């Protein structure tokens, strides 16, 4: 192992319930759809917003409307997270592990499906730049055609720390 690739939402920061709540509200208000737990597991969690919106409304939305709804979802998510400080911390043990990696000069990156609009907010809430170079934080910029579990975003993250994905955990 030469480097470490981290997911973020739902693994290093336990915010999945907040994303699910925001998507459930968006689905109901904009598309009159009630999302089930199965819908969330199969079509929402870990997926970029563009793929989630394609699932909710396959062809009826303009690009402008998709962006508007995606931005609204992220605003709602941040409001939910900010209103409950219980969510605003790293997973137990993560800080110690990050300190160990940093001290031992182990390259590390984050690969997250989070929207670009959340990036500044995460940096305010979490000490990300203390542990990860700015260029090693890979987020959904709209260019990923496939959502997780597809390895595409992890491959990009490995390249950002100048490693082959096979040499990372």
Where are these regions (language model features)?
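A generic structural signal for short coil/turn motifs at secondary-structure boundaries
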Residues: 13, 108, 145-147
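Substrate-recognition "cap/lid" segment bordering the active-site pocket of phosphatases
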Residues: 87, 115-169
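Short active-site oxyanion
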Residues: 105-109, 166-168
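N-terminal helical cap/lid subdomain that shapes the substrate entry/recognition surface
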Residues: 2-95, 99-100, 104, 117
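Short, well-ordered alpha-helix to beta-strand connector turns
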Residues: 1, 105, 132-135
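Intrinsically disordered, low-complexity boundary segments flanking structured domains
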Residues: 64, 108, 124-126
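Short beta-strand/turn micro-motifs composed of small residues
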Residues: 112
């Amino acid at each position: 192992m030469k480097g470490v690739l981290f997911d973020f939402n739902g693994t290093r920061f336990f915010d999945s319930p907040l994303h699910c709540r925001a998507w459930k509200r968006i689905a109901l208000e904009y598309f009159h759809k009630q999302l089930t737990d199965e819908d969330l597991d199969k079509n929402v969690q870990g997926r970029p917003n563009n793929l989630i919106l394609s699932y909710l409304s396959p062809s009826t939305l303009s690009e402008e409307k998709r962006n508007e709804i995606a931005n609204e979802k992220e605003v709602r998510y941040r409001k939910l997270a900010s209103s409950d400080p219980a969510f605003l911390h790293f997973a137990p043990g993560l800080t110690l592990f990050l300190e160990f990696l940093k001290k031992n000069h182990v390259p590390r990156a984050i690969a997250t499906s989070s929207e670009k609009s959340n990036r500044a907010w995460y940096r305010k809430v979490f000490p990300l730049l203390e542990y990860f170079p700015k260029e090693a934080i890979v987020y959904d910029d709209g260019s990923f055609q496939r959502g997780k579990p597809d390895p595409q975003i992890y491959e990009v993250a490995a390249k950002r720390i100048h490693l082959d994905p096979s040499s990372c955990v």
